[in-house]
Structures are given as structure tokens and as C-alpha cells.
């Protein structure tokens, strides 16, 4: 079928994707919905803002409620953070951020849709209307459930067995998880009709483009992460002192911004671990006495991954898919103009609402 990208339809798709991101991961939700969203808006002239807000909400902020949502939270889960801890502790942060962004998006999209009169005539719509909307390839929901199951398995099952692979210890449960994920992907490829992928404009080109970029990013950020891990004894000692008071007590709002800003331009998963350990690394203490600090670290690493294309892998994947469909997306700094103008004021508001008054000494921002 063919959805028509009105403000209500677009906002509904973004809202659904935001919810799905914590269930099937930001990458899964983004890849599931980006092509239908692009097709729904293929008869509109102004649609870059639609993809930008899609990155904000579906590829980032929506994944903040469970370890399935985003890699930083999954690493926390592997460290022993309870599965529903993030949902319990940053639920309000996520809802406030999502509702505000959806409202801002609806206002911007309504302006373009109603005042700019930029919708093309229906006869020029590249996607023709059909009698009904529906799903093809529904068997893939089974393989998706299997993939989620393997991810959860690696966090819940502690085999106690490790293998040394090229000098890196790899736990048995992680090997089982990775083999399971590859198997689910293979079954999906084999059981899905080629016509479904053709009709969905599926291509490996965006995946390869993102893979090349992130291999380079992971190699180049390794020294930076190592310097951060050195803590007070490394070149970032000033940052360590910045996020604690004179008595060594964590300052939540500073953890939120330090974790977030670095996550926006480095890989957010190792950045989360750096600040997790910087805050003490004691799961029992971080999930109770220092719960507000861990909430700040969790929210910062997930939310601020939206600040740049390289803050989170789905960001660049969405950009690549959009460009592959023919949409001219903003440059790296062009996207940052959008993200900083919209997200920084939002994050300042979240700081005041959720992090400024949690600090033990009641320091006011």
C-alpha cells in the first residue's frame, strides 16, 4: 500500500518507531521504518526534516529504556545492571524528550505541509495507491524474535567458559549469541521472497558504506578511549576532576553532559563504560545509592548519540538509506546545525528537570 506523508502520519510513524527502538533496538527499528517513511513522503519537496527527526527519535532517544535498545545499555546489562533498571530510572526523561521532539516535529512538518504547498499532485506520486496496506515477509518477525532471544541469552547466561581469540578473551555465551544472530540473518535471507526486498528497495550498499566508516572510526578512537580509561592518571585527568566534587562525589549533571558530548563524537558504547567505571564501577552501588549518576550516564550516552552522524551507527545508516533513495541529506556539519539548534536546548531543559537537584550536596546548576 501507500501511506501519504501528512504531519499526522509522519508523527505517528516517528512515535511508533520511538517505542519499537527499545524493543528491537535502534538499528532494527530504524531499518524497519525508514524506507516506508521515505516512500510515504516521496511526493513532497521538503522532507529532510522528517529524516533528521527520525534520527533523533528512532535511531537514538527511543532506545533508552531497555538493554535491547542501544549498545551502551546492553553493556551495562552485561555488567549486572538489571534489565528494567533503565526503564524505571529514565522513563520520565525519555517520555519528556520524546513528547517535546514529536511536538516540535509536528509543528515544523505542519508548516511545510500546509503553508508551503509543496506536496506534488497525486498523479506525480512515485508510489501508487493500492487497495490496502499490509505486511509482506511476516516470517521475519520470527527471526527477529530469535535474534532478540540470542541477545538476551548472552546477558542472562554466564557459562564461565572463555576462549582466547587473538589475545582477546571471548565468553562462550557471546560466541553462541553471534552464531545465533548470523543464523537468524541467514534464515531471513533464505525465507524471504526476493520480490519483497525489491519492493522495499533493499540494498546492501548503505550497509557497506556504514561498515567502512565505522571500521575507520573504531580504529581511530581506540587511543582516545584508552586515554579516557586512564582516568586521573591520564591526559584527561581534568575531565575526571570536572565530574566530581572535592570529596570525590559524582556531580550528575556534569556526568550527563560529559558522557553525552563524548558519545556524540566517539562510539557511545565504550564511552558509557569509561564513565561507568569512572563513577566507581560498583553495580550494586550505582543502581542504588548512585542511581541518579548512572541514570545521567545512561541518558547522556543514548540521547546525545543523536548530535552527529557518527554518534550512533543507525544515524549514518539512515543517512545512507535516505541518500540511496535519492534524498539529498545535510552534510556532517549541516546535520549538526539541526541537532545543536534543536537538541541542545532540549538537553538543557532535561538537565534542569532531572539532574540538577539529584546531587548529594544539592548544588544548583
Put a short name on every predicted segment.
Residues 1-3, 38-41, 108-111, 187-202:
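C-terminal ends of transmembrane helices
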Residues 21, 31-46, 50-52, 58, ...:
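Membrane-interfacial helix-loop connectors
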Residues 10, 53, 131-143, 201-215, ...:
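Alpha-helical transmembrane segments and their helix-start/interface "positive-inside/aromatic belt" motifs
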Residues 12-19, 55-63, 123-130, 207-221, ...:
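Small-residue-rich segments of transmembrane alpha-helices in multi-pass membrane proteins
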Residues 143-274:
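Transmembrane helical segments that form the transport core of multi-pass membrane transport proteins
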Residues 65-66, 75, 84-129, 303-365:
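Juxtamembrane and boundary regions of transmembrane helices in multi-pass small-molecule transporters
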Residues 21-22, 26-29, 90-99, 173-184, ...:
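Structural signature of hydrophobic alpha-helical transmembrane segments
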Residues 101-163:
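Long, contiguous bundles of hydrophobic transmembrane helices that form the permeation core
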Amino acid at each position: 500500500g501507500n501511506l501519504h506523508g501528512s504531519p499526522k502520519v509522519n508523527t505517528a510513524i516517528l512515535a511508533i518507531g520511538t517505542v519499537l527502538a527499545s524493543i528491537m533496538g535502534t538499528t532494527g527499528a530504524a531499518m524497519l521504518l525508514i524506507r516506508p517513511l521515505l516512500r510515504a513522503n516521496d511526493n513532497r519537496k521538503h522532507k529532510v526534516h522528517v529524516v533528521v527527526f527520525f534520527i533523533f527519535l528512532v535511531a537514538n532517544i527511543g532506545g533508552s529504556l531497555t538493554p535491547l535498545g542501544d549498545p551502551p545499555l546492553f553493556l551495562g546489562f552485561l555488567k549486572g545492571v538489571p534489565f528494567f533498571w533503565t526503564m524505571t530510572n529514565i522513563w520520565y526523561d525519555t517520555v519528556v524528550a520524546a513528547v517535546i521532539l514529536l511536538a516540535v516535529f509536528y509543528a515544523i512538518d505542519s508548516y511545510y505541509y500546509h503553508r508551503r504547498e509543496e506536496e506534488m499532485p497525486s498523479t506525480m506520486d512515485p508510489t501508487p495507491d493500492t487497495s490496502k496496506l499490509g505486511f509482506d515477509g511476516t516470517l521475519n518477525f520470527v527471526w527477529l524474535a530469535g535474534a532478540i532471544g540470542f541477545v538476551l541469552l548472552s546477558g542472562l547466561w554466564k557459562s564461565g567458559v572463555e576462549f582466547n581469540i587473538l589475545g582477546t578473551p571471548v565468553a562462550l555465551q557471546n560466541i553462541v549469541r553471534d552464531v545465533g544472530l548470523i543464523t537468524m540473518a541467514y534464515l531471513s535471507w533464505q525465507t524471504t521472497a526476493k520480490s519483497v526486498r525489491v519492493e522495499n528497495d533493499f540494498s546492501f550498499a548503505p550497509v557497506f558504506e556504514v561498515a567502512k566508516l565505522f571500521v575507520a572510526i573504531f580504529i581511530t578512537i581506540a587511543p582516545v578511549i584508552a586515554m579516557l580509561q586512564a582516568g586521573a592518571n591520564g591526559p584527561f585527568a581534568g575531565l575526571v576532576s570536572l565530574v566530581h566534587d572535592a570529596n570525590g562525589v559524582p556531580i550528575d549533571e556534569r556526568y550527563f553532559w560529559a558522557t553525552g558530548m563524548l558519545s556524540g563524537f566517539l562510539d557511545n558504547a565504550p564511552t558509557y563504560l569509561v564513565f561507568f567505571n569512572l563513577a566507581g564501577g560498583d553495580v550494586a552501588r550505582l543502581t542504588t545509592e548512585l542511581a541518579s549518576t548512572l541514570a545521567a550516564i545512561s541518558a547522556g550516552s543514548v540521547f546525545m548519540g543523536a548530535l552527529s552522524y557518527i554518534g550512533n551507527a543507525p544515524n549514518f545508516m539512515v543517512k545512507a538509506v535516505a541518500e540511496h533513495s535519492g534524498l539529498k541529506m545535510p552534510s556532517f556539519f549541516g546535520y549538526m546545525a539541526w541537532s545543536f539548534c534543536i537538541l541542545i536546548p532540549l538537553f538543557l531543559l532535561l538537565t534542569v528537570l532531572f539532574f540538577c537537584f539529584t546531587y548529594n550536596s544539592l548544588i544548583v546548576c
